[in-house]
């Protein structure tokens, strides 16, 4: 393993060893508190452009499952068809993996997909730095090479445009109700969660004008980066809401886009919510759910139009976790009810949406 250094934009340095693809890289340094699920996290398009730090110390111990495609056309064990993170940062990479479904090691997978990995980092200290000072840009540099990699511009890039489908894709054709899925970087398990409930899914590009299509409901998927880069999608959502009261549901980026269409403002969280243990409360009830989350931006609920209200609130920091319209069947969650990986406490969100289609 070659010696590498993680250099944060404030000058803080962490020294470690390379266990992935040997190449320098720059991106936004973030942390994820999940104890498992690295195959899903690495292939989640929402992590595009990020240097992902896993706070759980042992990573790689169960290897990597095979990349297979289900009959429905979506990956079986991954959330997309490739790794989207720019690099993986861990405390202790486990070289000898063991799992009945593993076909290769995490290191071999990273190398095959040309994704750098760094181990031996004090991820506890790194997380404390990010928690105190906020997420920041960083570089992974090789100690025996000159620093000739440019700074990354995370907030100035439309990552949604990079990861979204470029063509219309149909799933479960011929099923009962039709749902248009706006792909901002949608995870495979969101598609799976819809088609297993007996609907046809029509996956469209993030900025596609679907208002003239024949469908029964609209679903706004997750995605990476700054939602303010996606105003084209917001305008189409507004157009749809002005034309009909067809059901609308959104997840993660979908929550932010629908909120923008409802007049709300978006702001960047200090260090985001990334992990499997985020508690949220359903507004107006005493019900609290443990959720899987992966976002760095949040909705300023105080700026919502008067016809809208909060649906969920984060119990840790009070930030918005979902909205709903007071009359029409339009609602969202900032968290991921489909999990994969993580808790499935809020899987009922898909049931609620499909029920509104009938």
What does each of the following model-derived ranges do?
Residues 1-207, 227, 235, 340, ...:
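RNA-binding accessory domains that recognize and position tRNA/RNA substrates
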Residues 5, 279-281, 322:
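Residue-level detector of beta-strand face positions
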Residues 208-214:
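Short amphipathic alpha-helix with an adjacent loop that forms part of the alpha/beta core around
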């Amino acid at each position: 393993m070659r010696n590498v250094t993680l250099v944060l934009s404030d000058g803080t340095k962490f020294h470690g060893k390379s266990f992935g693809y040997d190449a320098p890289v720059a991106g936004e340094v973030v942390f994820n508190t999940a104890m498992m699920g690295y195959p899903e996290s690495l292939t989640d398009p929402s992590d595009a452009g990020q240097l992902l730090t896993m706070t759980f110390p042992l990573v790689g111990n169960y290897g990597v499952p095979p990349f297979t495609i289900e009959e429905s056309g979506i990956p079986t064990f991954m959330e997309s068809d490739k790794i989207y993170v720019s690099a993986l940062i861990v405390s202790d990479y486990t070289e000898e993996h063991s799992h009945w479904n593993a076909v290769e090691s995490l290191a071999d997978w990273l190398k095959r997909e040309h994704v750098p990995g760094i181990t031996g980092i004090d991820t506890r200290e790194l997380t404390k730095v990010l928690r105190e000072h906020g997420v920041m840009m960083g570089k992974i540099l090789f100690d025996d090479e000159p620093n000739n990699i440019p700074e990354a511009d995370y907030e100035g890039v439309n990552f949604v445009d990079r990861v979204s489908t470029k063509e219309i894709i149909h799933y479960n054709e011929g099923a009962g109700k039709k749902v248009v899925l706006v792909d901002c970087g949608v995870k495979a398990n969101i598609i799976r969660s819809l088609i297993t409930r007996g609907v046809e899914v029509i996956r469209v590009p993030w900025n596609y004008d679907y208002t003239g299509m024949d469908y029964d409901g609209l679903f706004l998927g997750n995605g990476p980066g700054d939602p303010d880069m996606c105003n084209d999608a917001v305008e189409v959502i507004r157009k749809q809401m002005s034309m009909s009261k067809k059901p609308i549901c959104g997840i993660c980026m979908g929550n932010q886009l629908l909120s923008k269409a409802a007049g709300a403002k978006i702001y960047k969280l200090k260090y985001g919510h990334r992990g499997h243990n985020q508690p949220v409360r359903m507004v107006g009830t005493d019900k609290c759910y443990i959720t899987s989350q992966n976002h760095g931006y949040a909705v300023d609920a105080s700026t919502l139009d008067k016809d809208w209200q909060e649906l969920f609130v984060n119990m840790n920091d009070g930030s918005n976790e979902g909205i709903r319209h007071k009359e029409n069947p339009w609602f969202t969650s900032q968290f991921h009810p489909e999990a994969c990986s993580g808790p499935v406490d809020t899987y009922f969100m898909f049931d609620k949406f499909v029920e509104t289609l009938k």
